[in-house]
């Protein structure tokens, strides 16, 4: 009955709107969209109201039923605890006089001082007698490794460096040899001029022999 009444109400409302919007431009199209939204809204309201009415009797039934004993477990637990304990006993801790005294071993173990933690602070070398005595073992080991690496690198560099004889090439340094010869000739004292032979023993004039200096100059130019 309620659905029929709602349908009749929507029909009369839509007819009244169509009659009044017949002279408006685009009134019918607007009325159709408004009519659709009105129908959907009313259908939603009817559906929700019917659903609420169906759920109300289901909610009222559990309230009328007797209470379930499983819903109150704390009370049962308290009753069982009271029955388990005798009437004259109370669950209170024993006094200090009746408790057992701890043994000597336990007291010594509790009172024993804890081992001192190893200090991780580095000691300064100024407080120690020797230079390496104040260093931490790890630092000393690192320094030794660094020195060994430097020694190995120097040995490799010495091996890779060519000897001086190989650096000059296959032939000896000619300039060095000539320099020694020239310095020897220049540093020596000039020889005494030869005495002229007598006229009777005069021989025909000939070309004088070349000096050692001229020979060396020619050799340098030819080379």
Curated annotation (Swiss-Prot):
UniProt keywords, alphabetically: Acetylation, Cytoplasm, DNA-binding, Nucleus
First-listed, main subcellular location of the protein, grouped into a coarse class: cytoplasm
Residues recorded as bearing N-acetylmethionine in the entry: 1
Induction of expression: By growth factors and 12-O-tetradecanoylphorbol-13-acetate (TPA).
Molecular-function annotations in GO: DNA binding
GO cellular component: cytoplasm; nucleoplasm; nucleus
Biased composition (Basic and acidic residues): 69-78
Tissues/organs with expression: Expressed in activated T-cells (at protein level). Expression increases in metastatic tumor cells (at protein level).
Function: DNA-binding protein that seems to act as a transcription factor. Involved in the regulation of neuronal differentiation, acts upon JNK-signaling pathway activation and plays a role in neurite outgrowth in hippocampal cells. May mediate with FIBP FGF-signaling in the establishment of laterality in the embryo. Promotes cell motility, seems to stimulate tumor metastasis.
Name used for this protein in its record: Immediate early response gene 2 protein
Protein species of origin: Homo sapiens
